[in-house]
Design a protein with these regions (language model features):
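C-terminal "lid/loop" region of Rossmann-like NAD(P)-dependent oxidoreductases
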Residues: 230-232, 257-260, 269-275, 282-299, ...
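Residue-level signal for the nucleotide or nucleotide-sugar donor/cofactor binding architecture
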Residues: 106, 114-117, 167-171, 207-210, ...
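Hydrophobic "lid"/C-terminal helical patch
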Residues: 27, 247-251, 274-277, 323-330
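Glycine/proline-rich active-site loop of Rossmann-fold NAD(P)-dependent oxidoreductases
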Residues: 146, 174, 190, 199-213, ...
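N-terminal Rossmann-like NAD(P)+-binding domain of SDR-like oxidoreductases, especially those catalyzing
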Residues: 1-197, 325, 332-339, 343-348
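Hydrophobic alpha-helix immediately C-terminal to the catalytic Tyr-X-X-X-Lys motif of short-chain
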Residues: 175, 179, 183, 215, ...
Length: 348
């Protein structure tokens, strides 16, 4: 197993790719309590406003860069304060990947690159610095649930149509996991794969086709909440703070722990969530049903036995509390969203 011999002068140096995105910005925020944080993002599908409040901290540095390309940290003078040339990097969280249902077709190649080129680029960085490496994969690697199998465990191989409309993302995540595991086998890297299930909370992109924020926006505007499917469709929802706890706990484990499901194992009917949001926003919106869209995919729930036993992790935030926080954020930031007319409400 590769182990870094570089001295840690004050705090460990941690890279977060996709750090200006939804998950990444919350992760950077939490890591600042214990580390020097190098946030890397090309802002192609994220928002600098997510990390505006972090730019003031001396232990935080934002670098606009496309990690699909090889990266030489020595070329960035702004990282001299972290003594990267001498201390190196201790941890890499690789989160960068476009996930925009609204712009899914336009971002297909970006998704392909994120699950291939950027994997090699960031894994090569981990080899150079002998850094621990965590990749955020997705529940899509399991394929769709069946009547016989609703909850997925880490040993389930899954069935994914690699030539489907979603193949660049779904099969892309499977290939990305293969990259991670291959680097472990060849270089002895201490690598982690988090299979992330549906996650929600403040800083999700608004008007981008994501279920919870679009439901909230439509509810506060008294517009119809459109469910693409039937009233019995179910999803699990994990609040962002719980997900960040899980990622941090996973990174803290030794090389014996390399793969885990993170998400909520409690499912709700989409119609129930829509009804909750209508009531919580005192909305006059109606729930309507339409045929599923071409990129829609049913998703199962995670079996969390490994997360509970190996990480001591379970999601703690109640759905009602998480939705309230997300509603408050959405109302506060609604005016910052440019209104370009209606577009379909999709599911990630």
């Amino acid at each position: 197993m590769l182990e870094s011999s570089n001295p840690i002068f004050e705090k460990k140096n941690v890279i977060v790719t996709g750090g200006a995105g939804f998950l990444g910005s919350h992760l950077c925020e939490r890591l600042l309590q214990e580390a020097d944080v190098i946030c890397i993002d090309n802002l192609s599908n994220s928002n600098i406003q997510n990390i505006d409040h972090l730019l003031q901290y001396p232990d935080f540095e934002f670098i606009k860069y496309d990690v699909n390309k090889p990266m030489d940290l020595d070329q960035f003078e702004e990282l001299d304060k972290f003594k990267v040339k001498f201390q190196g990097v201790q941890e890499i969280y690789h989160l960068a990947c476009p996930t925009s249902p609204k712009n899914f077709e336009q971002l297909k190649l970006n998704s392909l690159w994120a699950n291939s080129s950027s994997m090699i680029s960031t894994l090569d960085l981990a080899v150079k610095y002998k850094a621990k490496y965590l990749f955020t994969s997705s529940s899509v690697v399991y394929g769709e649930p069946t009547e016989q199998r609703i909850a997925f465990s880490e040993n389930d191989e899954g069935i994914v149509n690699h030539l489907s409309t979603r193949g660049c993302y779904n099969e892309g995540k499977r290939f990305a996991e293969t990259c991670v595991e291959t680097y472990r086998q060849v270089y002895g890297l201490d690598v982690k794969i988090a299979r992330v299930f549906n996650t929600y909370g403040p800083r999700m992109k608004l008007r981008d086709g994501l279920l919870i924020p679009d439901f909230i926006l439509n509810a506060i505007e008294d517009k119809d909440l459109v469910i693409y499917g039937d009233a019995d469709m179910e999803f699990s929802f994990c609040y962002i703070s719980d997900m960040i706890d899980g990622l941090l706990k996973l990174m803290q484990t030794g090389p014996e722990m390399s793969l885990v499901n993170l998400g909520s194992d409690q499912v709700y009917k989409i119609s129930e969530v829509a009804d909750m949001l209508i009531k919580m926003t005192n909305s006059s919106s109606k729930i309507v049903y339409e045929a599923p869209l071409s990129i829609f995919m049913h998703k199962g729930k995670p079996n969390l036995q490994r997360a509970k036993e190996m990480l001591g992790w379970i999601p703690l935030v109640r759905l009602s509390d998480g939705l309230r926080n997300t509603i408050d954020y959405t109302i506060a930031n609604k005016g910052m969203v440019e209104m370009n007319g209606d577009h379909p409400r999709l599911y990630r």
